[in-house]
Amino acid sequence: MYTSHEDIGYDFEDGPKDKKTLKPHPNIDGGWAWMMVLSSFFVHILIMGSQMALGVLNVEWLEEFHQSRGLTAWVSSLSMGITLIVGPFIGLFINTCGCRQTAIIGGLVNSLGWVLSAYAANVHYLFITFGVAAGLGSGMAYLPAVVMVGRYFQKRRALAQGLSTTGTGFGTFLMTVLLKYLCAEYGWRNAMLIQGAVSLNLCVCGALMRPLSPGKNPNDPGEKDVRGLPAHSTESVKSTGQQGRTEEKDGGLGNEETLCDLQAQECPDQAGHRKNMCALRILKTVSWLTMRVRKGFEDWYSGYFGTASLFTNRMFVAFIFWALFAYSSFVIPFIHLPEIVNLYNLSEQNDVFPLTSIIAIVHIFGKVILGVIADLPCISVWNVFLLANFTLVLSIFILPLMHTYAGLAVICALIGFSSGYFSLMPVVTEDLVGIEHLANAYGIIICANGISALLGPPFAGWIYDITQKYDFSFYICGLLYMIGILFLLIQPCIRIIEQSRRKYMDGAHV
């Protein structure tokens, strides 16, 4: 599904040190790097796979709460949208805390969102617990997974990102089957409790994301509390713990009564030293945290808001408009296909092999095949990208016309294959803005995709509530998608016209 941040050049630091030229590390392109791929693969399964399977729960929520389809669709849309929208802002946590801590916290928040959602009394409760909480946790765990793969790989980065993101397709297939089974056997509330427990594995995946630099972080306050103190303070610490034994070694056995008197006299001094040390440690910790948060915020702010020149690039602005319309057309089938299956009485065939699973499996092959085709020297990446977009929008228009399982299966396969163009988005973005602005530009595109995922499914459900047909939902969303594609087509034409006019003006001056 989302390649999200494949090859986007994120360079967040797990430690607070300034970036330096790194020597070749034994784990680059090998060793522990493949554990990063495995960790990222399971993150994609647990996060993206479960989000693409939310159509199963959407049907259960409609039956439980008896709300409109438009309102109910907001639950899954919030979760999907927030996962993507918060991507650039999660960079602040990564700069401050590191990838490992961010991912572990994200796993806990995501699991908490699933568990609290099991006790929902209405749809509005789910907006907060599942849409916001689970979505935020997903975003916090997802971005570090992609960032760490990029940091551990240089020569094989494309292969590593491709392998890790295939977890989305596998996850969609597995999570759809799992949620259908859990809902049938235990009910949707217990299914969400179990899914919350499963989501705790995100913490395990996060624990595998160890920084490249071996050893402990020298800037950690717990490690430098003593070493970073003045010399006399360090001596005081040593003396308080070992003074009695030192005196015994240096001065012999001595008089026991004299030794007791000396220790009694020094107790107030030791207590004073301990208080001073405790206060000094607290001050050092607060100062260290303040500096680290400040540096992380400055890096994040300069990275995402210091590139206003990107918006002077009209092709990039057109690409943003495309992203605002495009992503919802991919998400809508996942959310509403289970309901369409029920409307057409195709549940028996769909139980054997769910339509959403067809999209997920073919999507894996689509990403690989389209990537290989786009790498051919005789083929333009833009042409492959546009052709895949046209195929996807055509499939969206045709889907409502299919009322049989076989017809829907063929269209779902086309949707899955053509949506593999998501693996080309980083390449297209780099062509537009250059490698130096790739990270920031791609973060903006992902935000636009998140807005599209947030608004698309509720809009389709709202249209169904008015017309009592899903046909118009797909037609209107497909039309909006076509408008986004037209933005991409118009801009090259404008560029050609401007170049021709410039050449004409230059010739006239000569």
Curated annotation (Swiss-Prot):
Biased composition, class Polar residues, residue ranges: 233-244
Region listing for Disordered, in residue ranges: 214-255
GO cellular component, one term: plasma membrane
Spans through the membrane: 28-48, 74-94, 103-123, 127-147, 159-179, 191-209, 315-335, 353-373, 379-399, 408-428, 443-463, 474-494
Pfam families: MFS_1
UniProt topological domain (Cytoplasmic) ranges: 1-27, 495-510
Topology term for the membrane: Multi-pass membrane protein
GO biological process, one term: carboxylic acid transmembrane transport
Domain of life: Eukaryota
UniProt entry keywords in alphabetical sequence: Cell membrane, Membrane, Symport, Transmembrane, Transmembrane helix, Transport
Function: Proton-linked monocarboxylate transporter. May catalyze the transport of monocarboxylates across the plasma membrane.
Protein name stated in the entry: Monocarboxylate transporter 14
Organism listed in the record: Homo sapiens
